[in-house]
Amino acid sequence: MNIIDELEWRGAIYQQTDEEGLRKWVEEKQISLYCGIDPSGDSMHIGHLIPFMILRRFQNAGHRPIILVGGATGTIGDPSGKKEERKLQSMEQISKNVESLRVQLGKIFDFEGDSAASMVNNYDWTKDVSILDFLRDYGKEFNVNTMLSKDIVASRLEVGISFTEFAYQILQAMDFNHLYEFNDCRLQIGGSDQWGNITAGLDLIRKKQGENAKAFGLTIPLLTKADGTKFGKSEGGAIWLNPEKTTPYEFYQFWINTDDRDVVKYLKYFTFLTEAEIDELAKQVEEEPHLRAAQKTLAAEMTKFVHSEEALEQALKISKALFSGDVTALTADEIEQGFKDVPTFVAEDAEVNLVDWLVTLGIEPSKRQAREDVTNGAIYINGERQQNVEKVIDASDRIENKFTIVRRGKKKYFLVSYK
């Protein structure tokens, strides 16, 4: 199957320039193509992942992906999709963000073999361009009327846009032209809001490299959820690729909780499963939705891809422990992941009566209520039911000498750490 046909089947193409020419080019040649990201933060979220998944599909089809981290464009900020001016960050912060993104993107691609990926930073070829060079060599190639007509600029004219952000499309066009000239890059991929920037690059390539220069652009549709809300966010905020911001367990749970109406679309977008495999999962969604086979597959595939097989095993282990209530097999790291959002208390490193301990920490409102809950078997320590009001909490009740997990009733968890 031609890679363009596969992308169309997956619903991953919104717009493309010269479809016939691109189809022929990717069938006959191994091409280099790129997608960029600006280091506006120290982590990608899953919304950022979408165009890079397309880039990875091209790599799987034998083409060479170029990952561009915008050390230069990141100092300005892309106005696309923004209603107001971005706040500029320091060069020091941008440099830190660049390195963080390099690590995350490095996990997604293969950097060896015939279709080895490469990673570039546009700061390397823009840092020595003087203002006069910029105006003479590039500014002269851009018609202001054309720039004003592009959606990314036109949508901001009423509220105002600085020259800095207005000129962003020139810098992105310079990137495409540079990669065309020095890396033989023929295709740029981006989100649907990048169409204006991509076509600006194609225009510059034709002016700089000649009318016969072959280059293409492809954008991806905006991904929305069936309920109309924005994809990539949970109640707790964005779902990050950085495990310190979104743990692998939280990441896994995000995908597990996918709506039945969205799961097949996400399987097509985000996994490398075949059409036959996805069709079978779609059938299961229709016939046995309660088994959530499609969601489990999606969560497993994504956690492995972004994190690792080990991270997936941890997420499954935590999920099983929380479902069964048997938490004794969890490590301290797994406890921190699985209980990140439960009420957390810090206890003194001392032996204390269970009833007093529950009240002192604030898990129980009074000794009377604490005794009643213990007597009725509603209190669990590390998954074990406690019915002895005389029990003493000591070091033996700690997991890895760090945590004690308290459960009240069937689902109310508390995490206790120690001074």
UniProtKB/Swiss-Prot annotation:
Binding residue positions for L-tyrosine: 34, 168, 172
Transmembrane segments: none
Example of a GO MF term: RNA binding
Gene name of this polypeptide: tyrS
Motif ('KMSKS' region): 230-234
Domain S4 RNA-binding, chain residue ranges per copy: 352-418
Protein name, entry field: Tyrosine--tRNA ligase
CDD domains in the record: S4, TyrRS_core
